[in-house]
């Protein structure tokens, strides 16, 4: 049993199972229908350590090149699970449910997802148009309602979560998509009690017209659930909608609202260098998880080769060579690697003295009982010096820097005070407690 009998510094912090954080790390990817061979996709997913992939019925056919078997093979070879969505403009709920059952029976299904950004890709559902340039979103609302009901009425699928559409903040009429379930007296066009989803879904890209430049706390602020966030975040989609200012949840409810991100990321351009992109994406997964996002999917695994525009979002270049983002994430997931289960995470007594607003922490625990305290900085320039104090004298402490590699950069014995110099990336402190 792990014990910490030493001097109490503060209220001990309960850890989160390392696997729970690793399971949150997802990605958007091209597949054979967009010219990316499955074998290369498997190779890239494995290297980075992704645990889930955002997917759906767009581009899916019985004849291929992308079939249900493509996704089953991806799951079998990498262990990833799949969020399964209607994607852009899709309306075929029957196909979504049918193919989702195949994935579920193989253990490959993570969740169902509603339409992708209906403000950009409208739908025609049961003869009614909605979203896009239409004046009403009623068709979008009815489609999402029916998707939810179809999943929850199926005995195989009922326990799988349904994620909302993305961009409900763009609604042109108040059909209530800013709620998971429309509450009483909400004064929406759809009736009170209409249920759309189990999780809110946002596309909170780190760089946004209201926040276009690199800055301190860039990913931390993008994950902010309050009105202080200057990107397309939770508040502007489920608090007060950004387009027509329809009222959604109060802040105290937003703080605990189950939520996911199915698209975020950054492309390389101007002041956003390959190095900064790599740091942003690594910090992003940490900030999202710490601030309540159960799952986060970054756009994009590899740069698109079948469309124009800025194609430098990828962890990989078009020639399949890894950018720094891929290398840094590989190092982080390798350092944290854990495939075991931890029924009840323990608690660690620690404090960070002189902690500025650009320094954040996340306490994890592996299935073998080892604590992994991740402390990261989000400074654009300069450094912060902090001291991590432990309430007990651990047997050994190892410090890892994922921007350098996977091996420890420092090992300490019988040390309960750790000096850190932080700038723009995480340090993983692996703490091996004394056993008795």
Which residues make up each language-model segment?
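Boundary/entry segment of secreted carbohydrate-active catalytic domains
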Residues: 4-60
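Hydrophobic faces of well-ordered beta-strands that scaffold small-molecule active sites
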Residues: 23-29, 53-55, 80-86, 110-114, ...
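Aromatic-lined substrate-binding rim segments of carbohydrate-active enzymes
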Residues: 41-43, 52-109, 131-165
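Surface-exposed, active-site-proximal loop segments in enzymatic domains
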Residues: 66-67, 74-77, 92-102, 118-135, ...
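Noncatalytic carbohydrate-binding groove/subsite architecture in carbohydrate-active enzymes
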Residues: 94-96, 136-284, 291
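Aromatic/acidic polysaccharide-binding cleft in carbohydrate-active enzymes
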Residues: 265-338, 343-356
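Carbohydrate-binding surface patches
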Residues: 349-395, 402
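C-terminal beta-strand-rich structural cap/linker in extracellular carbohydrate-active enzymes
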Residues: 410-436
């Amino acid at each position: 049993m792990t014990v910490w009998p030493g001097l109490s510094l503060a209220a001990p912090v309960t850890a989160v199972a390392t696997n729970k954080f690793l399971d949150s790390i997802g990605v958007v990817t091209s597949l054979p229908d967009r010219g990316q061979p499955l074998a290369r996709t498997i190779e890239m997913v494995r290297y980075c350590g992704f645990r889930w992939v955002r997917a759906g019925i767009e581009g899916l056919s019985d004849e291929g090149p992308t079939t249900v078997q493509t996704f089953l093979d991806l799951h079998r070879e990498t262990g990833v699970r799949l969020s399964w969505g209607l994607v852009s403009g899709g309306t075929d709920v029957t196909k979504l449910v049918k193919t989702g059952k195949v994935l579920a029976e193989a253990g490959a299904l993570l969740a169902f997802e509603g339409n992708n950004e209906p403000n950009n890709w409208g739908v025609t559902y049961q003869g009614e148009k909605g979203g896009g340039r239409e004046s009403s979103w009623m068709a979008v609302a009815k489609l999402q309602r029916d998707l939810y009901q179809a999943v929850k009425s199926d005995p195989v699928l009922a326990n799988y979560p349904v994620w909302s559409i993305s961009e409900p903040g763009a609604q042109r009429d108040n059909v209530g998509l800013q709620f998971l379930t429309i509450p009483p007296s909400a004064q929406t066009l759809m009736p009170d009690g209409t249920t759309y989803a189990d999780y809110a879904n946002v596309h909170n890209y780190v760089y946004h017209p209201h926040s276009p430049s690199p800055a301190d706390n860039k990913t931390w602020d993008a994950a902010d659930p309050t009105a202080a966030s200057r990107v397309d975040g939770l508040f502007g989609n489920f608090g007060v909608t950004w387009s027509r200012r329809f009222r959604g949840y109060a802040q105290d409810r937003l703080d605990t609202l189950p939520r996911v991100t199915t698209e975020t990321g950054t492309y390389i351009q101007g002041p956003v260098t390959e190095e900064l992109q790599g740091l942003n994406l690594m910090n992003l997964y940490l900030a999202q998880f710490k601030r309540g996002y159960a799952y986060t999917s970054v756009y994009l695994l590899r740069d698109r080769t079948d469309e124009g525009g800025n194609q430098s979002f990828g962890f990989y270049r078009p020639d399949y060579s890894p950018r720094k983002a891929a290398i840094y994430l590989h190092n982080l997931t390798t350092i944290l690697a854990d495939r075991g289960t931890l029924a009840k995470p323990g608690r660690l007594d620690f404090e960070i003295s002189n902690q500025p607003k650009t320094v954040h922490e996340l306490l994890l625990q592996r299935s073998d009982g080892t604590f992994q305290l991740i402390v990261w900085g989000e400074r654009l320039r300069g450094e912060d010096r902090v001291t991590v104090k432990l309430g007990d004298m651990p047997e050994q402490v190892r410090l890892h820097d994922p921007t350098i590699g996977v091996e420890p950069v420092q090992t300490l014995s019988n040390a309960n005070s750790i000096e850190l110099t932080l700038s723009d990336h995480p340090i993983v402190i692996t703490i091996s407690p004394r056993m008795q």
